[in-house]
Structures are given as structure tokens and as C-alpha cells.
Amino acid sequence: MEKIVNADGSDAICPASAACAKSIRSYQESYSLGEEIANAVTHGIGVGLSIVALVLLVVRAVHYTPADLTARYVVGFSVFGSSLIVLYLCSTLYHALPRGAKYVFGVIDHCCIYVLIAGTYTASCLTTLYGAIGWTVFGVIWGLACSGSVIYSVFGHRVRWLSLVMYIAMGWLVVFVAKPLRERLPEISFLFLVLGGVLYTVGCVFYALKRIKWTHTIWHMFVIGGSVMHFFSLYLSF
């Protein structure tokens, strides 16, 4: 391939390459080494907790649900647990990897938030929100998750605020099915469901304040808290 040079003989930079590099630089968030270690450690712990959660939920479904419902619960709980593992693993890798490797895992990390939201809904759709209403919610939430992931994959950090709004909006779409959930879930399970949503939402405030030191680590802790609440909501749902 012929080398492109400027009129003065210096190497020219391909406009497309320059735009790509600029996008990558704008995406990479300026965390200190201490912050990145804390970010990686917190969600590394989340990976371990997620594996435990997946095992406990599946074991409970196998041993304590009626035979005709077992498959539905196992699949729903498996999707939820797997989405937790994927989210926390990708987040840990993103914060642990060297700066030059962050871009791809950063995009995957943010897309995994959509996966976790949809995975959480899936567990409820297959267990508590069965029937037409369950499949409607399932289709809507996965459609939004796929759309959000594609948008973020194409535009990256430039649509960070749009993604944040979508995360919150998708999470609180649950208000449209709050009545059947309230009627079908034990009170303690419904309480944990709501508490999980509140923790995720409060955590989004710290996510938005990324220019303030340590706020991203605080966001991570709120995410873990929300995940724990939703684990207990599902575990105590029957």
C-alpha cells in the first residue's frame, strides 16, 4: 500500500483512522490507578457473587418448584444468573485491562447493562408474569435492549446520556406490570424487587457524576446492591 505523506514530507494521518482514534480517546474515562483497582475489585467480587447466585437459584428451582413449572423457573433463573456473570466479568476486564485495550471492552461493558436489565425481566416473565403479559414484556424489553446495544456499539460514548436514560426507563417499565407482580409475589419478594430498582436508580446518579473521584466505584457498589436485592426477590418468589 502506498504511504501517504503531507506536502512537507511528514506522514499524513488517514482521516478515518484519526476519527477512530479520537473516538477511542474520548471514550476512555480518566480514572486514577487506585480508582481502576477499586473498580476492578468491586465487580470482580460481583463475578463470584453472581456464580453463587446462579447456583443457588437453579438448585432452589429444581428442588422446590412443581414439576410442571421447574423448566420455566430453571430457564428464567439461568438467564438472570448468566446475565449477572457476563455483566460483572466484562466490567472487571474493562477496568483491569491496559488503557489501549479498554475501548472494545468498554463498549461490551455498557451493552451488558442492557443484557442484565433484560435478563432480570426474563426471570420474572417466565415465572411470575406468565402468559400474554409476560411474553409482551419479554418482547418489549429485549427489543429495547438490542436497540440500545446497537446504538451504543455504533456511537459509543457520544450517546452515554441517552444510554443512561434508557437504562433507567427500561428498569422502571416495571410500573406497568406492578399490579400483577404485587398480586402474585410474596410481600417480601416484591419489597426486594422494588429495593433493587431503587438502588440501581440511585447508583445512576453517581454514574453520571464520573468527573468526581471515586463516584464510579460507588456506582459499582450500588449495582452490586441492586443485584443482591433482585437475587433475594427471585429466591423468595415462591
Curated annotation (Swiss-Prot):
One of its GO terms (molecular function) is pore-forming activity. GO terms for cellular component: plasma membrane. Keywords: Cell inner membrane, Cell membrane, Membrane, Transmembrane, Transmembrane helix. Coiled coil: none annotated. InterPro entries: AdipoR/HlyIII-related, Hy-lIII. The chain crosses the membrane at residues 39-59, 74-94, 103-123, 131-151, 161-181, 188-208, 218-238. It comes from the Bacteria. Signal peptide: none annotated. It is found in: Cell inner membrane. It is a multi-pass membrane protein. Belongs to the UPF0073 (Hly-III) family. This is UPF0073 membrane protein TP_1037. It comes from Treponema pallidum (strain Nichols).
